Amino acid sequence: MPSELAMNNDELHVVMFPFLAFGHISPFVQLSNKLFSHGVHVTFLSAASNIPRIRSTLNLNPAINVISLKFPNGITNTAELPPHLAGNLIHALDLTQDQVKSLLLELKPHYVFFDFAQHWLPKLASEVGIKSVHFSVYSAISDAYITVPSRFADVEGRNITFEDLKKPPPGYPQNSNISLKAFEAMDFMFLFTRFGEKNLTGYERVLQSLGECSFIVFKTCKEIEGPYLDYIETQFRKPVLLSGPLVPEPSTDVLEEKWSKWLDGFPAKSVILCSFGSETFLSDYQIKELASGLELTGLPFILVLNFPSNLSAKAELERALPKGYLERVKNRGVVHSGWFQQQLVLKHSSVGCYVCHGGFSSVIEAMVNECQLVLLPFKGDQFFNSKLIANDLKAGVEVNRSDEDGFFHKEDILEALKTVMLEDNKEQGKQIRENHMQWSKFLSNKEIQNKFITDLVAQLKSMA
């Protein structure tokens, strides 16, 4: 049931309504916690099956009300769907419009924060006198490159191609040398495919969301993505507000003894952690090359690999890993599948490098913990986040890949790791480490991070 908490006249009330993938839910939860700590009343909307996990990450605070939406087909998150059926989830979201409208009428919040898929929400919110805020879970560099009106400026009515996407849109920040490889551009072509009863593309949904909302909020800051934020503001001609990078609060959990004992056996900053999250599944060739590259370094490592829930992780690992691999690395390497205390492992003094997919939250987490970054992106905004860190900020290194198919070899993994772990006295490695340290200090400064939220709350109050 909706919240019955009494509202003070000067208390800001926001409703959070993310897309149903946990990669989207998590930033909304992080922002909810930050806003609540600054006196903002928060109500969270999601599917029933997601609520236990959401509650567990909302600082265990019962004052943040979580409301269950009903979904007619029972599909409630991307973990339950293969990628080619993700459109079904968006369609299911479209069918919640009447529920959402009734809740907004009852709750009467000042704002509703929403995600890319709910292109219909700005109009719906306006009809009931509520302002809508598009909260982008993606980096500004990504949105500025892909989902801006000028993306179609040179297309002239024809269908967009991956060759178009290899180049930045007209007006893209001139000081940026960002472009996409062929395999990266191909990954974004799904955004221009029509699906669902409304026959809209993902690009059209995002553009409508950004174009019709009251204003836009990004989980970044000018220091990191200034030129891209300015470009987006120019493209959509509306305020772009910032929450800051939403640096996660330190975990109150304790690292499991099996991990702490293993890590304690190695020197400071010598261990490589390699992990790609719960919804990224590597192919056999990718596993073989990645595992072999880690082996070639001669350094201790933890390799976390996950697989679809309908497969046996043990069987998949036995098939995909190089023959005799576990025996060869048994004294310095661990291959793990399943739940993993990533934040606590990154914090351990023995961990010195994080090989990840370039998800923005993962990158921030690594930089706060002073772990060197090796970036191996697989989809979407991960490609841009990796380029931002490696090219713009020069605070990490991206694994070299072939242009056409994204293929990488064990030697590419080795070279990237050598740059930040074994050749830190050479110019490139030295520069990366120095830049990384500066960004780590910036992100770890609680006064700076607190000011981002203080300023955002002040702006929200002034615009309510």
From Swiss-Prot:
Binding of an anthocyanidin, residues: 24, 380
Tissue expression notes: Expressed in young leaves, flowers, pods and pod shells. Barely detected in seeds, roots and root nodules.
PROSITE patterns: UDPGT
InterPro entries the record matches: UDP-glycosyltransf_plant (IPR050481), UDP_glucos_trans (IPR002213), UDP_glycos_trans_CS (IPR035595)
SUPFAM superfamilies per record: UDP-Glycosyltransferase/glycogen phosphorylase
Gene3D superfamilies according to UniProt: Glycogen Phosphorylase B (3.40.50.2000)
Active site: 24 (proton acceptor), 115 (charge relay)
Ligand binding (UDP-beta-L-rhamnose): 278, 357, 362, 365
Domain of life: Eukaryota
Pfam families in alphabetical order: UDPGT
UniProt keyword annotations, A-Z: Glycosyltransferase, Transferase
Record field: catalytic activity: a flavonol 3-O-beta-D-glucoside + UDP-beta-L-rhamnose = a flavonol 3-O-[alpha-L-rhamnosyl-(1->6)-beta-D-glucoside] + UDP + H(+)
GO molecular function: flavonol-3-O-glucoside L-rhamnosyltransferase activity; UDP-glucosyltransferase activity
Record EC number: 2.4.1.159
Main function: Flavonol 3-O-glucoside (1->6) rhamnosyltransferase converting kaempferol 3-O-glucoside to kaempferol 3-O-rutinoside and utilizing 3-O-glucosylated/galactosylated flavonols and UDP-rhamnose as substrates. Prefers kaempferol to quercetin as an aglycon, and 3-O-galactosides to 3-O-glucosides as a glycosylation pattern.
Note: Flavonol glycosides (FGs) having rhamnose at the 6''-position of glucose or galactose that is bound to the 3-position of kaempferol are present in cv. Koganejiro, whereas FGs of cv. Kitakomachi are devoid of rhamnose.
PANTHER family registered for this protein in UniProt: GLYCOSYLTRANSFERASE, UDP-GLYCOSYLTRANSFERASE 79A6
Family of this protein: Belongs to the UDP-glycosyltransferase family.
Name listed for the protein in its UniProt record: UDP-glycosyltransferase 79A6
